[in-house]
A protein has these predicted regions:
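Signature of N-terminal electron-transfer/Fe-S-associated modules in redox systems
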Residues: 1-182
């Protein structure tokens, strides 16, 4: 066992880690449960993505020992179900949140992208999301979510149309309903 010191979401941690323990395993042990393992540590699903020293990484593919002295951000750094950040709310409003497994990593990556790019292109959005295996929706809703987040950051609210309704007479199916579990 080795002791490391790192900062996670602005909190300092002094942690005992085993030699081959993954960064993801350590983060979950510390209570950061948004860091998922949907690919048995293979590195293709991307649900284990964290921001490590201001760069996206797969936490299952890193050893916890590599985090000594590092600054790490997880999806918990963005907001709570009662106080979402602009990207999280925009993802809900755009109808993109269909998988609670992918959503934390996608929201974290889009938040990180908007911190680095004032007006990201579709190619930049594609690039930042390319590490997440997304099967539940296409990218169009993610583009809308980024546009909505930018609009809210600049104007404080949306004037653009959010997730479309498919038929006015439907109560739930085919009609967007904003809901954040938690």
């Amino acid at each position: 066992m080795n002791k490391i010191v790192c900062t996670v979401n602005g909190r300092n941690h002094s942690v005992e880690v085993k030699g081959a323990e993954s960064l993801r395993s350590m983060l979950v042990r510390l209570g950061y449960t948004s860091v998922r393992d949907s690919d048995d540590c293979e590195g293709f699903a991307g649900t284990d993505t964290v921001i490590f020293n201001d760069a996206p990484v797969y936490s299952n593919l890193m050893l916890a020992q590599q985090a000594d002295g590092a600054e790490i951000r997880t999806a918990e750094s963005m907001g709570t179900s009662r106080n979402l950040n602009v990207v999280q709310q925009a993802m809900i409003d755009a109808g993109v949140v269909q998988s609670a497994y992918n959503a934390p990593a996608a929201a974290l990556l889009l938040t990180w992208l908007l911190e680095h790019e004032t007006r990201p292109s579709r190619e930049q959005i594609d690039q930042v999301l390319s590490g997440i295996f997304i099967r539940d929706t296409g990218y169009e809703h993610y583009y809308l979510a980024v546009d909505l987040a930018l609009e809210r950051m600049q104007k404080g609210s949306y004037s653009s149309e959010i997730a479309p309704s498919f038929r006015a007479e439907l109560t739930y199916v085919g009609t967007p309903k904003s809901k954040a579990d938690g």
